Amino acid sequence: MSFPLHPSLVNGITKGNPSFQGGVLKCKCSTSPVTVTLRSNVAHNHACGCSKCWKPEGALFSIVSVVPVDKLEVTANGDKLAVVDPSATILRHACTGCGVHLYGRIEKDHAFKGLDFVHTELSDEKGWQEPQFAGFVTSIIEQGFDARHIDDVRAQFESLGLESYDALNPPLMNAIAAFTAANEAKA
């Protein structure tokens, strides 16, 4: 059984170019689109099943990655951006015209502060880092997906060469745990 994981995964995974230097993300508005320029490749690219990330219509997962804050610049129509949920840890800046999330930034003290979350599918350039894993897989159940088929979803990711996790991958979870431990030691 096959499920609509994400449009960019339909034909398998296209390898990125390790020397790729970035490009422009653009919202879906046909006139006056918001553009964001990334001056580096991304890291930790992954399929995300959480309920907060922007997903293309019909997709079960988003494809999201990070870039250093100083490598991201809103380059056109930034006045159309608004934070989706000001109480969230990741402040997702979405276009008020089309609803697409252009970037997410963490302002409070967090292991990932200094990294912006982005969706490279919003770019026409080729060479972005390919997805590395699938995270928050069981979160799609909370959004209405039939739990009886979650193992089929995991198998579909496995067929693409991606490990699936119910949180982030171990290196990212280790970073969060180390950050938490260091902060608790200071208290």
Curated annotation (Swiss-Prot):
SUPFAM superfamilies: Mss4-like. One of its GO terms (biological process) is formaldehyde catabolic process. Its cofactor is Zn(2+). Its EC number is 4.4.1.22. PROSITE patterns: CENP_V_GFA. Binds 2 Zn(2+) ions per subunit. The keyword Metal-binding applies. Zn(2+) 1 binds at C27, C29, C95, C98. Transmembrane segments: none annotated. Zn(2+) 2 binds at C48, C50, C53. Pathway: One-carbon metabolism; formaldehyde degradation; formate from formaldehyde (glutathione route): step 1/3. The keyword Metal-binding applies. Catalyzes the condensation of formaldehyde and glutathione to S-hydroxymethylglutathione. NCBIfam families: formald_GSH, PRK05417.1. This is Putative glutathione-dependent formaldehyde-activating enzyme. It comes from Verticillium alfalfae (strain VaMs.102 / ATCC MYA-4576 / FGSC 10136).
